[in-house]
């Protein structure tokens, strides 16, 4: 039997790379890797965005104030608690650069980019593994035991990719209290929250004002079916930390059309 040769690491939605490596025509691939809403972009966006093509002849507002205010209205928080980025991936990277975690605990199986970005700043990632026998539901008592003082960052995807398991807000409070006691920062990725039957019951955004060890990430790639626009945002009540992250960020990482797409008033 021939030994299987390992393939290079690449994102599962990179159909051109799959075609190149495996020889499968990209037209014959049905991709389940990116979890983008199959209904596609909204009718309003399809109709309105072409009207704003001239916007690419101008630099966008460096502070993205109108966009942040619109997002703030959408998620019911002060726009000063919001930082926008070039997709949630840029924000994951920025959080890692600022926090410089040495020992991160990631609830998995989950998105591989968390571990990748943590490794780039010299940190190590350990996994708290959800069990298929428990339908991938979080065992809060077991997680609490794993949150020891040598852990400095906890990463949660809620709802989780790929298991779809959810953590309700009351459970999240228990986790955050435990982490605060041990000096652990918590990054919650809510990229898939709009797919949940009741997003308002699981989002951690209402907790941002009460926990300075919490940051929540979201974006428009999945539910709003616009990964090519690259628009993500972070919500954090710790404004000192948010300003630190912003200071590390390059200017104008959100292009003009993405900013318009995210701003319902445009």
Stretch-by-stretch model annotation:
Residues 27-28, 78-82, 103, 190, ...:
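Short acidic capping loops at alpha-helix termini that bridge into adjacent secondary structure
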Residues 71, 118, 179:
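Short hydrophobic alpha-helical segments of the AMP-binding
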Residues 64-103:
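Phosphate-binding glycine-rich loop
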Residues 1-58:
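N-terminal "arm"/small-domain region of PLP-dependent enzymes with the aminotransferase-like
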Residues 97-156:
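PLP-dependent aminotransferase-like
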Residues 41-42, 63, 213-265:
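PLP-dependent aminotransferase class I/II
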Residues 137-150, 162-186, 190-223:
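Active-site pre-lysine segment of PLP-dependent enzymes
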């Amino acid at each position: 039997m021939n030994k299987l040769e390992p393939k290079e690491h690449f994102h599962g939605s990179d159909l051109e790379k799959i075609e190149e490596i495996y020889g499968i025509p990209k037209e014959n691939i049905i991709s389940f890797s990116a979890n983008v809403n199959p209904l596609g972009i909204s009718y309003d966006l399809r109709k309105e965005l072409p009207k704003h093509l001239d916007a690419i002849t101008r630099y966008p507002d460096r502070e993205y104030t109108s966009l942040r205010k619109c997002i703030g209205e959408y998620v019911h928080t002060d726009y000063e608690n919001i930082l926008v980025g070039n997709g949630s991936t840029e924000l994951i990277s920025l959080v890692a650069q600022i926090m410089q975690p040495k020992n991160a605990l990631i609830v998995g199986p989950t998105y591989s980019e968390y571990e990748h970005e943590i490794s780039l700043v010299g940190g190590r990632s350990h996994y708290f593994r959800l069990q298929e026998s428990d339908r991938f539901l979080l065992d809060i008592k077991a997680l609490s035991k794993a949150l020891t003082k040598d852990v400095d960052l906890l990463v949660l995807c809620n709802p989780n990719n790929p298991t779809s398991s959810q953590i309700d807000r009351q459970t999240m409070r228990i986790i955050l209290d435990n982490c605060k006691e041990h000096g652990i920062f918590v990054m919650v990725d809510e990229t898939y929250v709009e797919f949940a039957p009741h997003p308002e019951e699981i989002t951690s955004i209402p907790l941002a004002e009460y926990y300075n060890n919490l940051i929540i990430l979201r974006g428009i790639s999945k539910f709003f079916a616009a990964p090519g626009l690259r628009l993500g945002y972070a919500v954090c009540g710790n404004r000192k930390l948010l300003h630190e992250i912003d200071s590390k960020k390059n200017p104008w990482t959100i292009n003009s059309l993405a900013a318009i797409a995210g701003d319902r008033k445009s």
